[in-house]
């Protein structure tokens, strides 16, 4: 009986943890990821753009490139505290199907890391893509930075923050797309 009670308590704890970690949009992204056709692109996973564990990106190379060979660099949301590139497979897959090459990146998370670590990671990923464009068979001449929520903040910050003055790829960025991000920010301190 004691063992049964302990097993029930463990199951309750597991269920509570699952409930706390579940986000409704996770279900939607998993569904969309599953339904996206996979025959119009090639995917390379977990490419290391830096030395930190989360300095990884997935690269989706289209099989039907647009004339300008645009590259979308997508940054996930998650309040800088959670989120993962795998939550946004559908972004990479959908845009690759439409003729874009797409890099979907992970970045270091809070609270272990604070601003500007997230933005620095994005700058480092862009640098990696530029330095390895021949090996990766991509063009970085026409980049589009795109992010959701915290990721939208990161893409704006890599171009417009005071720290961005050392960012040498601004001329290659042809568009910035922010999805539900915080856009009014003051870089004080």
Protein language model regions, located:
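Residues at the C-terminal ends
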Residues: 10-13, 97, 131
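N-terminal cap/lid segment of alpha/beta-hydrolase-fold proteins
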Residues: 19-66
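Short beta-strand element of the alpha/beta-hydrolase
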Residues: 68-77
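Short beta-to-alpha linker loops that shape the active-site pocket of alpha/beta-hydrolase fold enzymes
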Residues: 78, 106-110, 182
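Short N-terminal helix/helix-N-cap motif within the alpha/beta-hydrolase-1
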Residues: 82-89, 112-113, 187
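Short amphipathic alpha-helix adjacent to the substrate-entry channel of hydrolases
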Residues: 86-103
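Alpha/beta-hydrolase active-site loop
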Residues: 113-134
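Primarily recognizes the serine-hydrolase "nucleophile elbow" in alpha/beta-hydrolase
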Residues: 127-189
């Amino acid at each position: 009986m004691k063992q049964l009670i302990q097993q029930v308590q463990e199951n309750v704890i597991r269920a509570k943890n699952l409930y706390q970690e579940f986000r409704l949009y996770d279900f939607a992204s998993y569904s969309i990821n599953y339904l996206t056709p996979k025959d119009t692109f090639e995917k390379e996973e977990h490419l290391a753009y830096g030395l930190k564990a989360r300095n990884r990106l997935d690269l989706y190379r289209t099989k039907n490139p647009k004339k300008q060979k645009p590259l979308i660099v997508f940054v996930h949301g998650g309040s800088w505290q959670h989120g993962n590139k795998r939550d946004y497979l559908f972004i990479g897959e959908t845009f690759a199907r439409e003729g874009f090459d797409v890099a979907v990146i992970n970045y270091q998370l809070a609270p272990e890391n604070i601003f500007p670590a997230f933005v620095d990671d994005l700058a480092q990923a862009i640098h990696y893509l530029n330095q390895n464009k021949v090996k990766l068979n991509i063009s970085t001449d026409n980049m589009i930075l795109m992010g959701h929520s915290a990721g939208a903040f990161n893409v704006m910050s890599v171009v417009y923050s005071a720290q961005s003055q050392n960012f040498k790829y601004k001329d290659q960025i042809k568009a910035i797309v922010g999805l539900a991000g915080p856009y009014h920010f003051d870089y004080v301190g």
